[in-house]
Every structure is written in C-alpha cells, then in structure tokens.
Amino acid sequence: MPRVLIGPYLLRNQPGRFRQILTDAGFELIDPVGDFSLTSSQIRPHLPDIDAMLAGGERMTRDLFAIAPRLRAIARTGVGYDLIDVAAASAHKVAVTITPGTNQDSVAEQTMALLFALARRIVSNDRVIHSGGWERALVAPIRGKTLGLIGMGRIGRAVALRALAFRMRVVAFDTYIHAEFDERHGIERLPLDELLVTSDVVSLHLPLTDATRGMVNREFLAKMRPGSYLVNTSRGGLIVETDLRDALVSGHLTAAGLDVLCHEPPEPGNPLLGLPNVVLSPHIAGTDTQSMRDMAELAATTIVELHQNRWPADCVVNSELRNDWRW
C-alpha cells in the first residue's frame, strides 16, 4: 500500500474530503507529530517509507531527497514552492505540484484587511482603548488613493478587483501582461520605479526566487512615496527587514502590514517586532476554511492522478520530468 505523509499542521489528524480522496485510491495516510511546520528532523524518520507527501511549509532539501528512495510526488498546498529544492526533486524523479486557483481570494481578502488595518489605524486604536485611552485621530481615506501592485498573477488580479470596488486607482508592474484584464478594469501598467513614486500603497505579490530575494531593500524603499504603506502577503524573503525597519522608524513609510517574515515564527531579535507601525499576521493569508479545503483536495487529487500515471500538467512545477517520470 502506498503511503502519503500529511505535512500541514492544519491538516494533520484533521478530517476532510482530501483523506477520502487518498484512501479511496489505496493510500495509507501518515500524520506525524511535530511543530506547526515540520522540521527536517521530524520529517526525516518517515522519508524512507513514504511514496508521496502532501506538503505545506516543510522544507525539502537535497539531503532529504537522498534518503527517500520511494518518494515520487510532493503536492504543495498553495502556489509557492521556494522551500522545496526543485532541482534535487527532479534529479530524484520526484514530481512537485502546486494548487493554482485555490487560494487567491483568501490572500486578496487578507491583503485588503492589512491595508485597512494600516490606513484606518484599527490595531493601534484597539490597543489604546484596551489600555484605558480614547484617542480619536483623523485618518486618510482609501478611496481615491493609488494602489501599486507588484505582481499580477491570480492573486494580484484578485486584489485589484477588491481595491477597485473601494474606488482606488490601481497601477501595476509585472513582466507578464494581461491586456484584456487591464483594459476591462482600467489598470495602468507602469515601470517599477514609476509605480513606487506614484503609489500610496505598494502591495507585493511575487514568488520568492533568486531574482526577487531581498528586492525590497534600502534603495527600493527610498523610491517609495513618502508617507506610503507597504503590504506583503507573498514571501518574507522579498524584504530586507532591517532596511524596512529603518524606513518605518524614520517616518519615510507610514506603516507596513506583513503576513510573512524572513524567519517564521520570527526570531526574538527580528527588527520589526515591537514597532507600533507594523501590523503582523502569522502567514495565514492563503488559508481560510474554504481555501484550505480546496488546496487539500486538489493536492490529494494530483497525488492520485500521478499514482495512476496521469499527468496534472497545470499543477506540476518540474514539467521536464513528464516524458520519463513513472510512479
């Protein structure tokens, strides 16, 4: 009987249709005991005996693939796969899949929630009242302000639609053009530097790659409009956190809303902890009850399809394996 390891904390030992999808296909499910994100030492004992992994925030490095001779598929819940050494996966003939189209609405809602938390001072007002105060300061409106989206994939476009509903002007930067969407919704494409100067709010919607790692650095932040806001619901590694701290402490940026950090959970010395103008959430943007269910079911389905030697082309990251991959 093939065995699949269940990685995400929110799915381990939890009911769900994804379990039925896998058990109906003849899989035995393994639910490890471990931290919110399983560590390498918690995954390692299971690797020699599993055929697939339904993954969340677990890191899969080259040395782990080397001790997983039966492993044929890693099905990632979500669309980011920067924690998986895809080159090593390909070298060991392990298909890596993602779940496109399952969580963009959840991420977009969290993006807007962070934007409003910053602009309307929701968190700081809450803290003041709970500590016995009652301060009523004016805030700037969102309507009429310019939102700059860096990245216009499914998530960026979902954010754009919500911002437009609040009568914001939306500008965007991406190397991929969705001309029909842009024209239909009045979205203007700008060069990156112009977007930074123009936008009242900059929101990041990019994968973490060698090209994007640390792109939000001192120079990037200096180009942003004075008094603007930064929102990040993609990957913490996009931002140089010490540089962001400096921009926030100096007042060049008014505030930042972050669902992601470079190290999660944050280490005690994280430079952003304790800043009154930073609103944080624990990397939950993509995981509401609906999106978690959809991601789990699609991930389970891709494992089953691969086991049956069907190729879920829209979900496989390392498509170069297709011609000679076998379960």
Where are these regions (language model features)?
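An N-terminal-biased, well-structured beta-alpha scaffold segment characteristic
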Residues: 1-97, 217
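Glycine-rich, N-terminal phosphate-binding loop of Rossmann-like dinucleotide-binding domains
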Residues: 8, 55-57, 78, 204-206, ...
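Short beta->alpha connector loops at strand-helix junctions that form conserved
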Residues: 33, 77-78, 94-105, 174, ...
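Short, Asp-centered acidic motifs that coordinate Mg2+ and/or phosphate
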Residues: 51-52, 73, 201, 229, ...
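Rossmann-like adenosine-cofactor binding region
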Residues: 62-65, 175-271
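Phosphate-binding beta-alpha-beta segment of Rossmann-like dinucleotide-binding domains, i.e.
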Residues: 92-94, 100-146, 158-161, 310-317
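Rossmann-like dinucleotide-binding domain for NAD(H)/NADP(H)
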Residues: 96, 218, 227-327
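Glycine-rich Rossmann-fold phosphate-binding loop(s) that bind the pyrophosphate
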Residues: 152-153
